[in-house]
Structures are given as C-alpha cells and as structure tokens.
Amino acid sequence: MQRVSVVRTDTLRLLTTPELDDFLRRVGDATAKLINMENYRRRRQFFETGKIDYSWQSAWARRFAEYYSVYKLLGSKNFAEACRLISDQWKSFLGLLKAAKEGKLEPWQKVRPPGYKKRDGQRIPIIIVRADGYRVDLERKLLYLKYWNVNIPFTGKPRWLIKQGAKQGRLIITYDPVKKRWYARLSVEVVLERRLDNGLKAGIDLGRERLIAFVTEPSEKGEGVALLYRGGPLKADYFYFERRIAEIDRMLSDPRSEEMDRSVLKEMHRRLYEKRKRHRDQVFANAAAHLAGMCLELKVGAVFIGGLRGLAQDKPGKGNTNVWSYRKLEMRLATTFENHGIALFEIPEDGTSKVCARHGCEVVRKPRGLVRCPHGHVMHADVNAAMNILKRGGGRVPQRVKVLSFIPTASKVIAVNEKKNGNPA
C-alpha cells in the first residue's frame, strides 16, 4: 500500500436563528467587501500596468487604513486568512496565464482575473476562518467560531474529519440564495491508501444513451466484465425540468404579469435550475460510487477513461453536452476512484467507436447501438469503444465479456436483469 496525502471537503448545513443569521450576514458582507475592494485594486493594477499582485501581504498592509473596519470585525487571524485566499486566487490566475502562453489550454478557454463577490448588484456573503479559529463538536453538533465566541448548530455528519489522522484546514461559510441556507465547508487533509498490487486494467467510455461503459481485462477464468450505466433517468430529468422552466419563461415574457408575480416566478426559475443541477450531480455521485465498489469487487487496480475534449465546441447543444456535463462526471470518477485507492488515467478517445477492438478494422454501425465487424461478429458500440480505450491503455482485450446493466438515479443505482440471446460482445 502507498500512502498519499490529499485534501477533501466536508459540507455541513448550518441551523441558524434570526440572531445567528444577522451575525453571519454582517461578517459575511464585511469579508465580501474586503475581497471586492482588493480584487478591484489588483484588477486595476493588472489592466493598467500588466503586473500581477499575488502577495497576501499587500492586502495585510492596508489593515489599518482602508480595510480597518473589516479588520476590526474579522480579527487578525481571519483577516489574514481572507488575504491568503485572495492571494491564492491571483496565483491561480498567474498559473493559468503561463499555461495559456505555453499552449497548454484549449483555444476556447479564456483566462480572466478574479472577479467580485456580487450578484444582482448585491454582495454575496462569505466568511473565511483560519484552521485554528474554529472547532467542530461532533457530539453536540455545534460549530464554534473562536474569535466571535459563537456556537452554531449544524446538521450532517462529516465524512473526512472523523478519519484517523485527519487535519482540519480553512473553513469557508457561504450562503445559498436559492435554498436560503447557510453552509460550512471544511477543508480536511487526510491520508489515503493506494494499492500497488498488479490488479486488472479497465477502460471507460462516456456516452449519451449509456452514461458509462466499463470493460475489464479477462480474469483468471478468461472472461472480462462489462458494466453499462444507462443515461435514461438523467435525460428524463433534463427534459422534465426544461419543460417546467419553459413554462415559467412564457409567464415571465407576458407583459400582463405584475411585478410581484415576476419576483416569485424568478425565484421559482432559479430553484428549478438549481434542482436540475443537484439531480445531475447526485446521479454522477451514485454512479461513480457504485462503479468504484464494483472495481474493488472485480480487483481492478487501474482504469483508463476516454477524454472528451472539444465536444461542447464541436457539437454544442442539449443533445450532447448540456445535460451530461462529461467533464464533471470525469472529475467525480477521478475523485471517487482516488478515495478507493484506484488509479485513473485519461487517454484520447478519438475514433474508438469506429474501429473494431479485436481486429483493428473499421466497423459498420447497426441499429440499436450495435456495430458489425467485417470478420462477422457483432458487438455493442459502447462496449467496443471501452475495449479500444482499454487497448490504448496497454490492457488485454477480452474475447468474451459478461455484461451487467445498471440504472443510476438520484437516490440509488438499480441493477437490471436482462435476458439476452447471445453475448453482445
């Protein structure tokens, strides 16, 4: 086993009273004011001189001048931590500029300097607390902010903070205007164990009808395993919310709607967008967790995934990218696999659906998601693509595979028992 130190985040929902809500808004507004003022100064310096100020001490030096009221409210430690957060953002901007000059970014990836904590002309409250400035009482479920001597009840169970050897880091408290709730996000440094044994290799192809197609190398029995995760529920969710959002858009475009009705409709509009996003993210999380568990069961140690680069630019629209958001799915898979000690590698997936994984010849697309090889065998198109990705990663292509199908939903992953006349691979 190899021990690797990583940073993870625990999210807690804060249970506030009107008094606590006023306190959080006051402190959060002051922190947002600091971030906006400092980013305005640095952005102006960047656009006028081309120089990038990424030092946290330049903001710290102004604590007794223009930032004194914020400094007095936040305290020395938390003010310094907010300055470090601003510095981290500008260091990231500098790194992206260097990557763009070296040609490491795609042409459509535009690099912009850090912006402002504002929405609809109002500051978005945010509270930043240093690692030693708070304490989490897991028994009483209280978040204690030391400088202000305030206890805030919370709900939820931290996943990473309770692990042995976990080290708490920066705390960020934010307000969700759609849900009208406060959330505390704890940065936690933990040590994960990564397996170094020679497990099986596997390939992953991401798609539309089949959200994930996963194929392993042949096991000791000489047979591989293919796992297919359907994208039907995800697509159904998208079209359901799209229809609901379109109805509200029609009502908003009606000039007869009164101002009060419009404010309510806009609130519903934002809630539907947020709910659709949450459903999608939860489907991704459930599918990734289930697949990681299957990898451990099948003794898979390394996984190769086909990277979908440029899809949103080459084939934009809801049919390809709007609902599936492949990059987020890929990042979710990478994080979940890392948590389970499984290595994930990205390789190009160009042409993997057009070539037979066994013979290397061009295949003919048939109805119902099948491809036909000139040598006579028929294979599921997504299984064939996953095999090609596995092959590109240096894995062995199985001659026969056992196919298992699953339906990932926002609540769980459902196994599908299908009776097939023959092996689709």
Model-flagged regions — what are they?
Residues 1-81:
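Gly/serine-rich nucleotide phosphate-binding loop at the start of the catalytic core
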Residues 2-7, 191-192, 318, 324-425:
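Positively charged, low-complexity nucleic-acid-binding target-recognition regions
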Residues 38, 81-93, 383-393:
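Stable alpha-helical structural segments in soluble proteins, enriched in small hydrophobic residues
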Residues 47-56, 60, 177-181, 185-202, ...:
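Substrate-contacting helices/loops that form the catalytic groove of nucleic-acid
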Residues 55-176:
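Acidic carboxylate diad motif detector
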Residues 134, 140-146, 211-218, 369-372:
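Short polybasic amphipathic segments
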Residues 146-166, 195-199, 221-233, 379-383:
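Short amphipathic beta-strand/extended segments with alternating polar/hydrophobic composition
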